[in-house]
């Protein structure tokens, strides 16, 4: 098995302060580019409405990884599915990809909304979202993800 060493290119500043399954919407945060990268690496990004952001579940522990089928969120109404069918910190590399909306760029700071990472999260990579690189046909999925994520993007101000 190959091993890769990666360094974060940016850090999430502000936004969500705790991990929570739902109510991720409407929260603004900053993706702050590390000083090691010249500002020129962001040139032109302000012309895009959305970003593709790969980040690490930095609050997760190695022992959180689960390499077996289980019901999403522990809900027995949903079918047991394998590790690579889940989008959470229990994956082997504890990485996630999100598609926040880019509001503006201020120097090293990319102000975004709807980034479901918490303050202090290391960003491994970022790129503009190209519509042409999204799914090329209709998306098919079982019913449980829509049921499970029905409240995911509700406004965070409505959190119980």
Language-model regions: role of each:
Residues 1-99, 103-160:
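Glycine-rich, low-complexity intrinsically disordered segments
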């Amino acid at each position: 098995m190959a091993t890769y060493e990666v360094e974060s290119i940016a850090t999430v500043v502000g936004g969500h302060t705790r991990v929570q399954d739902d109510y991720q919407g409407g929260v603004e945060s900053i993706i702050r580019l590390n000083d090691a990268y010249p500002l020129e690496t962001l040139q032109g990004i302000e012309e895009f409405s959305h970003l593709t952001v790969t980040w690490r579940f930095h609050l997760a522990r190695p022992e959180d990884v689960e390499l077996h089928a289980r019901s999403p969120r522990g809900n027995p109404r949903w079918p047991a599915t394998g590790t690579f069918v889940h989008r959470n910190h229990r994956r082997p590399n504890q990485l996630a990809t999100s598609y926040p909306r880019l509001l503006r760029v201020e120097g090293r700071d990319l102000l975004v909304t709807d980034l479901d990472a918490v303050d202090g999260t290391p960003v491994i990579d970022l790129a503009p979202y190209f519509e042409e690189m999204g799914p090329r046909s209709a998306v098919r999925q079982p019913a449980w993800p829509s049921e499970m994520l029905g409240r995911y993007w509700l406004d965070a101000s409505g959190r119980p």
